[in-house]
């Protein structure tokens, strides 16, 4: 006769526990399957945690930071570079316009300067 066991609740591990288990799996002489068995975790789950650890998403979750997909990060970095390029261009335009205004003011001042006695007559 087959004994049917009741549904077991899955154990939820904290981020610190996951990091400790992952770090243990990277130790010399330790294998993923061995560490997984020691902690009652499926090897596939441990491989997933290792991948997340290497991508930095496990530590981001531990620090309470928001995890952003790599594609969104790449798009944001591209947008930042484009905005920095535009800012540099606008800064150069602004400097040129400042110089033009100063040059125009200097010419205007010379054109409207009163003639002093003995200058032209």
UniProtKB/Swiss-Prot annotation:
| A Pfam match | HTH_Tnp_1
Task: Decide whether keyword Flavoprotein is in the record.
Answer: no
GO molecular function, one example? Answer: transposase activity
| GO biological process entries | DNA transposition
What superkingdom does the record give? Bacteria
Gene3D superfamilies documented for this protein: Winged helix-like DNA-binding domain superfamily/Winged helix DNA-binding domain (1.10.10.10)
Alphabetic keyword roster: DNA recombination, DNA-binding, Transposable element, Transposition
The record's listing under PANTHER family reads: TRANSPOSASE INSC FOR INSERTION ELEMENT IS2A-RELATED
Protein purpose: Involved in the transposition of the insertion sequence IS2.
Concerning its family, UniProt says: Belongs to the transposase 8 family.
In its UniProt entry, what is this protein called? Transposase InsC for insertion element IS2-8
Q: Which species does this protein come from?
A: Escherichia coli (strain K12)
């Amino acid at each position: 006769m087959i004994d049917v066991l009741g549904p077991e609740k899955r154990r939820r591990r904290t981020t610190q526990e996951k990091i400790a288990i992952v770090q243990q799996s990277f130790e010399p002489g330790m294998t993923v399957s061995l560490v997984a068995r020691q902690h009652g975790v499926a090897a596939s789950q441990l491989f997933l945690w290792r991948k997340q650890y290497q991508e930095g998403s496990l530590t981001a979750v531990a620090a309470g930071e928001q995890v952003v997909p790599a594609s969104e990060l790449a798009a944001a970095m591209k947008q930042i570079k484009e905005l920095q390029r535009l800012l540099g261009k606008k800064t150069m335009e602004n400097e040129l316009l400042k110089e033009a205004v100063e040059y125009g003011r200097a010419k205007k001042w010379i054109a409207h300067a009163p003639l002093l006695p003995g200058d032209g007559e």
